[in-house]
Swiss-Prot record:
The record marks S73 as: Interaction with substrate tRNA. Its EC number is 2.5.1.75. The gene is miaA. It comes from Helicobacter pylori (strain Shi470). Its cofactor is Mg(2+). Catalyzes the transfer of a dimethylallyl group onto the adenine at position 37 in tRNAs that read codons beginning with uridine, leading to the formation of N6-(dimethylallyl)adenosine (i(6)A). It catalyses: adenosine(37) in tRNA + dimethylallyl diphosphate = N(6)-dimethylallyladenosine(37) in tRNA + diphosphate. Monomer. GO terms for molecular function: ATP binding; tRNA dimethylallyltransferase activity. This is tRNA dimethylallyltransferase. The keyword tRNA processing applies. Residues 9-12 are annotated as: Interaction with substrate tRNA.
Amino acid sequence: MDAEIFSLDSLSIYKDINIASAKPSLKERKNIKHYALDYLSIDEKNNAPLFKTLLEDAMRVSSKEVLLIVGGSSFYLKSILEGLSDTPKISGEEAVKIEQEINSLANPYAFLKSIDPTSAFKIHPNDTYRIHKALEIFYSTHTPPSEYFKTNPKKPFEHAISLFALSIEKSALANNIKQRTKNMLDCGLIEEIKALYAQYPKDSQPFKAIGVKESILFLEKQLTLKKLEEAIISNTIQLAKRQNTFNKTQFNNLYTGSVGEVRHAILNHSKSAIKG
């Protein structure tokens, strides 16, 4: 297939995180153009609006008929496809103050419920990411998020995208994850994270990712090497389970199959799309 790849991955977008992200090698990237890799510094934040901007840029400049969007950030993909509202523009200083306000709350979800029951009803109490985003809007606009979105409605994504997902038998997936984790450790995962953790702020977004956060616990002597490996494997299996459930319940017209079936379906779809 004559295609290019857009990486919708919240870890591969960072420079210097190569092992923890299982990023494509430079050789692989030389043969096939990849977008949205090595774009951010460790102390910068990734989010759905950023990925949407990068995706639209890639679609505009790509010289190929097909652009494959690949990755694990299903929540971002859903946000992009459903449409994003314009978010309030705030300075770096304001962002720091807002972050401090939110972090000082004893119960962020309870506070959100008190100022905007409508928004709180749509968010699970354990969904810390969405709770945080809702409170950011409140503190930056002094308006309940539900009211803000009434005057700043979502802008739907203007391109049609076909969706495909791999279905892998549980034991095979677990074995893949175990082998991937072993490979990461053998390739120097701990050394990679040790260097980055010493160089960047401790609250940097990538330091919360699976594979990274467990390595930090090991470096802080809270985990043994054996427990580190077990924790990465267990947390990755749980993440894969959550992603699978999310994909099945949140996307319409999702084609699911084995590696061979999905490959065949994508090839057929790309041929018909090009002809059309």
